[in-house]
Swiss-Prot record:
The lineage of its organism: Bacteria, Bacillati, Bacillota, Bacilli, Bacillales. InterPro entries: GGGP/HepGP_synthase_I, GGGP/HepGP_synthase_sf, GGGP_HepGP_synthase. This is Heptaprenylglyceryl phosphate synthase. Homodimer. Belongs to the GGGP/HepGP synthase family. Group I subfamily.
């Protein structure tokens, strides 16, 4: 079993986007700590299974971030369950999770499942629009969500999601200072090694996603930048 607490860098792959076998091999053999499979729209059991089978040719740990109950399948090392703490819709905070537990609760391996407390901060992002996230937050608001995840809900992961735009480094630093047990994940807008290294100063885990599809070479350079190898 892998220890997610030591992961510094992960790639996130969208099953609804095209990725060549060559580029997938580069990602999986890059030295990243894990590959997360997940997306906001167009996620189906078929494209999730296709991605799973492709990644399983390699030794890298593989995580399914669950956004649709219908796309859950066995075979991943871990399952991340996002709860969008700043969503205006209860279904994205606990509703979908309740449905999943009704359907799969009896067969879940709880050692493989981790809840993520998301705070979505880019109003233009698909995930913000889908979940109706309240993104016009002050730093105090964000820190309060971090405390909620860390101290009240005791979630293992607090995820600052800027999805498509580069975030506020000072805010990431201040959020990290508040967390006692939750690991801080940062995702959003990382387009080069310098940005990845900057966020890695404060985030426990840096998530690199969109740049994979735009500039694979820059994406690969983020691994060493984050892990200092």
């Amino acid at each position: 079993m892998y220890d997610i607490s030591g992961w510094k860098h992960v790639f996130k792959l969208d099953p609804n986007k095209e990725l060549s076998d060559e580029h997938l091999e580069m990602i999986c053999e890059s030295g990243t700590d894990a590959v997360i499979v997940g997306g906001s729209d167009g996620v189906t059991i078929d494209n999730v299974l296709h991605m799973l089978v492709s990644i399983r040719r390699y030794a890298v740990p593989c995580v399914l971030e669950v956004s649709d109950v219908e796309a859950i399948t066995p075979g991943f090392d871990f399952y991340y369950i996002p709860s969008v703490l700043n969503s205006r819709k209860v279904e994205w905070v606990t509703g979908v999770h309740h449905e999943a537990l009704k359907e799969f609760g009896d067969i879940m391996d709880w050692d493989e499942i981790f809840m993520e407390g998301y705070c979505v901060l880019n109003p233009e992002a698909k995930v913000a629009q889908l979940t109706e996230a309240k993104c016009d937050l002050t730093e105090d608001d964000v820190i309060a969500y971090a405390r909620l995840a860390d101290k009240l809900l005791h979630l293992p992961i607090f995820y600052l999601e800027y999805s498509g735009t580069y975030g506020d480094v000072e805010l990431v630093k201040n959020v990290k200072a508040e967390l006692k047990q939750a690991k801080l994940y940062y995702g959003g807008g990382i387009s080069n090694a310098e940005q990845a290294k900057e966020m890695a100063q404060y985030a426990d885990t840096v998530v690199v996603g969109n740049i994979i599809y735009d500039d694979i070479k820059s994406a690969l350079k983020t691994v060493k930048a984050v892990k200092g190898e």
